[in-house]
Design a protein with these regions (language model features):
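Short, ordered, surface-exposed loop/turn motifs in non-cytosolic proteins
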Residues: 37-40, 45-60
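Residue-level marker for the onset of beta-strands and adjacent loop->beta junctions
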Residues: 52, 59, 113, 235-236
Length: 243
């Protein structure tokens, strides 16, 4: 589901608990953390300056950083796998191999986890940007070719990545982003590394939405069905503000 409202972009890949916003308590607003908070941390820019008003979520609850950039959530870590920020308008996050790093995985069996995030001020005006939209690469083994349903082999995907890099290189007056609308792999979880290999040299971040063919089809639960997607691309539900 994609929702564009006055330059704001919200990405949701699959059904999950709806996020509810909670406020920081008095301790956190004074720059201290409650010892009972399961998740906590600080959001700052790349110069070490705290950033107030950034939304931070565990996928179920959402809070906002205070004046000192601090945030905390009283989460049940047995039920949560990620903590992530909503990238605010005017900021970027570091990318690793083309994948934006706005999230951190919560280690298993942790009772408390500290997650700090660094945001970088976006260069130039935030009102102009280019989004390269892709959908349904549905990569298959090189030997598979293209069948009657047009599910593509990896070499066609590699050509697409090459075209995207060349196009992005011609856009120098505004930021470039990409969004893949799902079905990156066609039910073959062994191809995730091949898919991510195509992104590693991108100079722009690629955001993703999970598709039905990106789920483990015979998984016993929804959580297990998205495990491979999450391993490579992070949480299935998140938001980004542009413009």
């Amino acid at each position: 589901i994609f929702l564009f409202i006055i330059g704001a972009l919200c990405l949701c890949g699959c059904a999950d608990d709806f996020a509810t916003k909670i406020n920081l308590d008095g301790n956190s607003s004074e720059g201290e953390f409650n010892s009972e908070a399961a998740l906590y941390g600080t959001v700052q820019d790349n110069y070490g300056k705290p950033i107030a008003g950034v939304l931070v979520s565990d996928g179920m609850q959402t809070t906002e950083t205070d004046a000192k950039g601090n945030w905390q959530l009283f989460s049940d870590l047995k039920l949560r796998r990620f903590v992530f920020v909503t990238i605010p308008a005017g900021y970027e996050v570091p990318s690793k191999n083309g994948i934006p790093q706005f999230w951190q995985r919560i280690p298993e069996n942790e009772k408390q986890f500290k997650a700090d995030f660094t945001l970088m001020k976006r260069a130039g005006s935030g009102d102009r940007y280019t989004i390269l939209m892709t959908a349904d690469p549905q990569i298959r083994a090189k030997t598979a070719g293209t069948d009657k349903y047009m599910f593509h082999s990896i070499d066609i995907y590699e050509d697409m990545c090459k075209d995207m890099k060349e196009l992005a290189a011609t856009i120098t007056d505004r930021p470039v982003y990409s969004i893949c609308l799902g079905d990156m792999v066609h039910n073959n979880m062994s191809l995730w590394e091949d898919y991510c290999e195509g992104l590693k040299d991108f100079s722009f971040p690629v955001f993703h939405v999970i598709g039905n063919h990106d789920h483990i089809q015979n998984a016993a639960s929804d959580d297990l069905a998205v495990a491979e997607y999450e391993k490579y691309l992070g949480p299935t539900n998140y938001a980004v503000d542009l413009g």
